[in-house]
Amino acid sequence: MTLSQTAVSRPQIFICTLLSSESLVDLYTQILEGDRYSLVHATYDNFLEIVEQGKHRIDCLIFEKNAALPKVVSHLHREAILLPAVLLQVEESVEKTSQPNSADRDPQQDSYYHIAEVIVDHDQEDILSSIDCAIAQFLQLSKACRLPTRLQKKYADEAIQDNLATQQQRLSQKLKERLGYLGVYYKRNPQQFFHKLTEEEQTDYLVTLKRDYRDIILNYFRQDSSVNQEIDDFVTQIFFADISILKILEIHMELMDAFAKKLKLEGRNEDILLDYRLTLIDIMAHLCEMYRRSIPKTR
């Protein structure tokens, strides 16, 4: 079983699974079907061969966290193969109930494969977001990826840390280049979303956002202005902060009200402000296009 060369040219996410249960194979085949994913199911006999041959094309691994995992991971470490990974928690044990999923896990807590892995219950329905999270965390790794604590000393003499760092950097760049604009979506950090900020941080953020929007309004109809770049920067900013369109509309209306009051005091007609609806439409169109081109298709 190998990865198709013709499929590589399509903007798909390549998934390689290592599952011992046929029911899990059938389940993930059904979930991951469609034009977004290209899927290959490996066995314990051919997994290492498939990964070694396809390490430049595979975007994410999905394997079970079971008794065979240490041997598999050990081989990947020796070969300096580092890929985004989702680990399925399938063992019915005290360990399962005592260990949180990676979304709630302390970043300093020891890992199995690498510190960007995502651990989920095997029956978790939202495997798609787990894959997205695994890729996102992998892309945000520093150049030096830390091995699990229990393995650092074992592989220190083999300079495996440097090899893994090189592999991570190369694979990260490959993902960004091959996924193109789609890669922008994966660089979003949910912890930096507006609704995750403290009240004080939100206040400061809105002050900056309103100032930037005011500059765009003032420059929008000026000749030889840098307003196009300002709009691009503004849209990128609200995209990565996950700011809602309603919030942008609110900022626009507040600014228009302020301008209207000023014009009224000056005895001038405020109808001119209607032209600035084009500014709002322009920004919303830019933002919608960015989401359209960047959000992965589920099917």
Swiss-Prot record:
UniProt domain KaiA N-terminal: residue ranges: 9-179
Region (PsR domain, binds oxidized quinones), start-end ranges: 9-148
Pfam families: KaiA, KaiA_N
Keywords assigned by UniProt, alphabetized: Biological rhythms
Region (Flexible linker): 180-188
Domain KaiA C-terminal: start-end pairs: 189-297
GO BP terms: circadian rhythm
Coiled coil, from the record: none
Gene3D superfamilies: 3.40.50.2300, KaiA/RbsU domain (1.10.1240.30)
Domain-level remarks: The N-terminal pseudoreceiver domain (PsR, approximately equal to KaiA N-terminal) binds oxidized quinones. The KaiA C-terminal domain mediates interaction with KaiC, homodimerization, and is responsible for the clock oscillation function.
Assembly and binders: Homodimer. The KaiABC complex composition changes during the circadian cycle to control KaiC phosphorylation. Complexes KaiC(6), KaiA(2-4):KaiC(6), KaiB(6):KaiC(6) and KaiC(6):KaiB(6):KaiA(12) are among the most important forms, many form cooperatively. KaiA and CikA bind to the same region of the KaiB(fs) form and therefore compete.
Protein function: Key component of the KaiABC oscillator complex, which constitutes the main circadian regulator in cyanobacteria. Complex composition changes during the circadian cycle to control KaiC phosphorylation. KaiA stimulates KaiC autophosphorylation, while KaiB sequesters KaiA, leading to KaiC autodephosphorylation. KaiA binding to the KaiC CII domain during the subjective day yields KaiA(2-4):KaiC(6) complexes which stimulate KaiC autophosphorylation. Binds oxidized quinones via the N-terminal PsR domain, allowing it to sense redox changes and possibly mediate clock input.
Name by which UniProt lists this protein: Circadian clock oscillator protein KaiA
Species the sequence originates in: Acaryochloris marina (strain MBIC 11017)
Organism phylogeny: Bacteria, Bacillati, Cyanobacteriota, Cyanophyceae, Acaryochloridales
